[in-house]
């Protein structure tokens, strides 16, 4: 099992590295980031992983709402790992004309390819980590399209992972 003070960083880093290796077009900027994921310099692409909420659990993936019995603490800890791949998206030209449908189509293909590759990388990695007993359990959430916001758009994938408390 993954343990210690950096256990959630370790999980997030493994997932970020798996996505990076799976992407057909790997972004220049990638890594584990603290807190909310900022879309800085999305023109060259961005892959970021972050650790969201961390909470005690007795019945994964549900947070422990109260102590049960005489126990002092829940036996498990769960964390939400947030992963995003963001790309440059088409926008209006200097005359204010909207992007062409061909440009939008190309962007949609790239972003949907990223979604497929993200989901495959995360699923494969978490399944292997679970089989190898590096983690206790996991649940993948739905992929959620992001943006466009400004000239950036992409995908967000979340997974909840369980480890023993320590």
List the model feature ranges, each with a label.
Residues 38-40, 68, 84, 123, ...:
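Secretory pathway export signals and precursors
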Residues 75-90, 150-165:
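Oligomerization/assembly interface segments of phage tail-like spikes and tubes
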Residues 22-31, 105-162:
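Acidic-leaning, charged glycine-interspersed low-complexity segments
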Residues 93-109:
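A solvent-exposed, charged loop/short amphipathic helix patch at secondary-structure junctions
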Residues 41-43, 71, 87, 126, ...:
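The N-terminal extracellular segments of secreted preproproteins, especially immediately downstream
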Residues 57, 88-93:
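Short regulatory "switch" loops immediately downstream of catalytic or recognition motifs
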Residues 1-73:
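Small/polar-rich, solvent-exposed N-terminal microdomains that initiate assembly or binding
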Residues 45-47, 75, 130, 155:
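General secretory precursor processing signal
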């Amino acid at each position: 099992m993954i343990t210690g003070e950096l256990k959630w960083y370790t999980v997030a880093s493994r997932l970020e590295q798996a996505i990076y290796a799976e992407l057909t077009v790997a972004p220049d900027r990638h890594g584990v980031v603290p807190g909310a994921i900022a879309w800085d310099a999305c023109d060259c692409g961005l892959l970021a992983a972050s650790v969201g909420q961390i909470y005690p659990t007795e019945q994964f993936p549900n947070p422990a709402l109260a102590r049960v019995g005489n126990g002092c603490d829940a036996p498990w800890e769960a964390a939400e790992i947030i992963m995003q791949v963001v790309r440059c998206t088409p926008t209006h030209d200097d005359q204010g004309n909207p992007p062409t449908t061909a440009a939008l189509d190309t962007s949609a293909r790239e972003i949907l390819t990223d979604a497929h590759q993200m989901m495959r990388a995360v699923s494969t990695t978490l399944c292997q980590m679970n089989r190898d007993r590096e983690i206790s359990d996991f649940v993948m959430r739905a992929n959620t399209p992001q943006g466009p916001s400004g000239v950036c758009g992409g995908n967000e994938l979340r997974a909840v992972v369980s480890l023993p408390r320590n």
